[in-house]
Every structure is written in structure tokens, then in C-alpha cells.
């Protein structure tokens, strides 16, 4: 029976020769992930199960990243709860401040996700690891609890949409523009409980950072997961970051897809998602005159070293607009250190931007950049729902690091070509 890439991974982890869409299966897990918001709830449910230990001390990862460094007493209590649980259960992959980072940048960096894995995380953007040719998806805290106790999870096998990427990207266009373009095409429910499977010669043109960004936002189209084929770039990344063995799965040529969508990368311009939904996209030349108050460059979507290099290229030798608060979040300590070694932090600081420790921060309206009533932000984050970054009457425009950096300089949503 012909299967998609996702179906092959799920079949293997279910101990089955084949699976078909709609089938309910029990799957063995390679990693169970949680953060400082979702894990306390999972701990409560885990304790109800009555298990004295997690299924595997090295296959559970907990990353306090949303409200860390602790923003208030309540968040400090949550992190204390998580910290004590990790110590009590001898969880090896607990990442304290100083080692932590934004979880979906940190997990691949630490080699905890490799090709062919099945990963669940109590965070919707767990789908990021599909960039490595893994099946990864977000779940609720109760599913995380069950996963920690049993090492297994139930899934309904998803159907798939095939995205064939062709051509090469134009200057200043990145993975963020690709996924915003796709979400603008199909809508936020356009891939509902489907696997978004990316293929085509254009995949080879994309950096791993681009692939992480695209897979990260598959959930914004309603997808169960997003996944890329494994190529030389993938293998190089995995070998650089992990000593684990891995398995490469390929979709069968005659696998069934709900539909196939062709994407010409050369025709995608810098793209911006307007409030208050990621599907509300416009190309940069359709934006018009929109003044802004804040720029956020970072998050699990666009806080990697490649993203910071692009932002620095735009900001080098320039000053951010005096009316724009510009906040930059390296996604992990390692990325922060690399940015320092490359002189990127100096460029940011000299431009008038501020550089934060790794944290999700303002992305979810947590801290470190909350918007007031009537304020607008350009952000490299993944969601722009009403009140997402602060006041319900604030606005968030989603864009790439290049567009965000250019907008910081001009004080309005701008193409990098206007600045560089």
C-alpha cells in the first residue's frame, strides 16, 4: 500500500506494515516535550495516573521558555513546579536558565530531534521538527502526561497535501515569506488535520533555518504537521548536532494526496500578514503607508542565527527610527553567543535596538515587549490574533526578519530594498 512520508513514519512507530488516512493507531514516542506553561498542568495529570517515573528519562524534555526569566511570582511558581518535577523524576533534558532557549530552536540544536522521529509536545509549534524529516505535532497537557507515563500516544492518521516547491528565491525573500504566501493561499484551515508535505527541486534551495520556519507555521494552516524530505543539508545538520541514529523515510511515488499545490518560489515577494489572522496576507508592494511603534525579531519562528544575520545586514550602519522600539531575541544561548562572536549584537546595539535573553516574551503577550492600546508592531513571530501581543486594540503584522529590520529603520512597514 502506497504511503506518504508521514504515514510511513507513523506505521513504523506503530509496528505496522502500512497505515491509511483516518486509521486510529497507537504509536511509540521518541520524545515528549513541555514548557513552563503547559508542563505544570501535565504534572497534575501525570500524578493522577499514579506512575512513579517517566517512561524514559532521556526521552522527556522540559524547556522553561515562555515566561523566563520569571516575569512575576506566578510564573516563578510555575517554573519552580517544573524544576522540582524534573529533579524528582531525574529527567535528563531539563534546561534551566543559562542552558535554555526557545524550545523549538533548542530541541534540534541539542540533537533531541532527528530524521524519522515521532515527537509530541505540549505546544502547538512542535510541528517545527518536520524540517528534519520527523513527524512532530502539538498536543494538550493531558496527552503530554500520558506520553511521559507510557511513551505512547494515539493518533488518527492524517491525509496529506503535497506542496511542490520549484524555482529559486528572490533577494530578501525567505522561508517566512513562503509560508505566509501559502497560508494566504489556503487559509488558516486550509490544511485542517492534514500533513503538509513539502517536496520539489526548490526544497534544495532552502536553508535549514528556512525549513524550520516553514514547518513551524504549518499549524497556522490548521495542519497536523509539516514535513520536509531528508537531503544532504538535513543530514549535515543532524550529524552536526546529534549522535543519535536516524531513519530516512521517503513518500511512495504513488502515495495519495488530498491535493497537490505547485509553488514557484521565484514569484514570491516579501509578504506581510495583516491583523488579525495569519491568512490576511499582502505582498510588500500592497502594504501602503503603515506606521509602527515596535519591531520584534526572534521567536521559535525566526530567532535562529540565519535570521539574525539577515536583520544585521539591514541594520548595519543604520539607526532604528526614534519612534520604534526594536527588540531582538536570539532563540538560544548558543545562537546568542554565535551572534556575539560574529559582531551581530554590536550592530544591533549600535542601531538603537535592544537585545534580550532567549525567551518567547512578547510573542504570546507574556513580557518583554507588550503592546499598549492603539500600538502596532511588526514581528517575526507566528501569530497575530486580536490581543496576541498585548492590548486587544493593538495590532501585529507578521513578516520576515528582513522586512522587520527595514521597518525598524523607516518607522513604517517597508521592503528591505528601501533601506539597503
Curated annotation (Swiss-Prot):
Binds 1 [4Fe-4S] cluster per subunit. Keywords: 4Fe-4S, Amino-acid biosynthesis, Branched-chain amino acid biosynthesis, Iron, Iron-sulfur, Leucine biosynthesis, Lyase, Metal-binding. Its cofactor is [4Fe-4S] cluster. GO terms for molecular function: 3-isopropylmalate dehydratase activity; 4 iron, 4 sulfur cluster binding; metal ion binding. Its EC number is 4.2.1.33. One of its GO terms (biological process) is L-leucine biosynthetic process. It catalyses: (2R,3S)-3-isopropylmalate = (2S)-2-isopropylmalate. Belongs to the aconitase/IPM isomerase family. LeuC type 2 subfamily. Catalyzes the isomerization between 2-isopropylmalate and 3-isopropylmalate, via the formation of 2-isopropylmaleate. This is 3-isopropylmalate dehydratase large subunit. It comes from Clostridium kluyveri (strain ATCC 8527 / DSM 555 / NBRC 12016 / NCIMB 10680 / K1).
Amino acid at each position: 500500500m502506497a504511503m506518504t512520508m508521514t504515514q510511513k513514519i507513523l506505521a513504523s512507530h506503530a509496528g505496522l506494515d502500512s497505515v491509511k488516512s483516518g486509521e486510529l493507531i497507537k504509536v511509540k514516542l521518541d520524545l515528549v516535550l513541555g514548557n513552563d506553561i503547559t508542563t505544570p498542568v501535565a504534572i497534575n495529570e501525570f500524578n493522577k495516573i499514579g506512575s512513579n517515573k517517566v517512561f524514559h528519562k532521556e526521552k522527556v524534555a522540559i524547556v522553561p521558555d515562555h515566561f523566563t526569566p520569571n516575569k512575576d511570582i506566578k510564573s516563578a511558581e510555575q517554573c519552580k513546579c517544573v524544576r522540582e518535577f524534573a529533579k524528582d523524576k531525574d529527567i535528563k533534558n531539563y534546561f534551566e536558565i543559562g542552558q535554555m532557549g526557545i524550545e523549538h530552536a533548542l530541541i534540534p540544536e541539542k540533537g533531541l530531534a532527528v530524521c524519522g522521529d515521532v515527537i509530541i509536545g505540549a505546544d502547538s509549534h512542535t510541528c517545527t521538527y518536520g524540517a528534519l524529516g520527523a513527524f512532530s505535532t502539538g498536543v494538550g497537557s493531558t496527552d503530554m502526561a500520558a506520553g511521559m507515563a507510557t511513551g505512547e500516544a494515539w493518533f488518527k492518521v492524517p491525509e496529506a497535501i503535497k506542496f511542490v516547491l520549484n524555482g529559486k528565491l528572490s533577494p530578501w525573500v525567505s522561508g517566512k515569506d513562503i509560508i505566509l504566501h501559502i497560508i494566504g493561499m489556503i487559509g488558516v484551515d486550509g490544511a485542517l488535520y492534514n500533513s503538509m508535505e513539502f517536496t520539489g527541486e526548490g526544497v534544495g534551495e532552502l536553508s535549514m533555518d528556512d525549513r524550520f520556519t516553514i514547518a513551524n507555521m504549518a499549524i497556522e494552516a490548521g495542519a497536523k504537521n509539516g514535513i520536509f524530505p531528508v537531503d544532504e543539508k538535513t543530514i549535515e545538520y543532524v550529524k552536526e548536532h546529534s549522535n543519535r541514529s536516524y531513519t530516512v523515510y521517503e513518500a511512495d511515488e504513488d502515495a495519495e494526496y488530498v491535493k497537490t499545490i505547485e509553488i514557484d518560489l521565484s514569484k514570491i515577494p516579501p509578504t506581510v500578514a495583516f491583523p488579525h489572522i495569519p491568512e490576511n496576507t499582502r505582498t510588500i508592494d500592497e502594504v501602503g503607508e503603515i506606521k509602527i511603534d515596535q519591531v520584534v525579531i526572534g521567536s521559535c519562528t525566526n530567532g535562529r542565527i540565519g535570521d539574525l544575520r539577515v536583520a544585521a545586514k539591514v541594520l548595519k550602519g543604520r539607526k532604528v527610527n526614534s519612534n520604534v522600539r526594536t527588540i531582538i531575541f536570539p532563540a538560544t544561548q548558543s545562537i546568542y553567543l554565535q551572534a556575539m562572536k560574529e559582531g551581530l549584537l554590536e550592530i544591533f546595539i549600535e542601531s538603537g535596538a535592544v537585545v534580550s535573553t532567549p525567551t518567547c516574551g512578547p510573542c504570546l503577550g507574556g513580557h518583554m515587549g507588550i503592546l499598549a492600546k492603539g500600538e502596532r508592531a511588526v514581528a517575526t513571530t507566528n501569530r497575530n490574533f486580536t490581543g496576541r501581543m498585548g492590548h486587544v486594540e493593538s495590532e501585529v503584522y507578521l513578516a520576515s526578519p528582513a522586512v522587520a529590520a527595514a521597518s525598524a529603520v523607516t518607522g513604517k512597514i517597508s521592503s528591505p530594498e528601501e533601506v539597503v
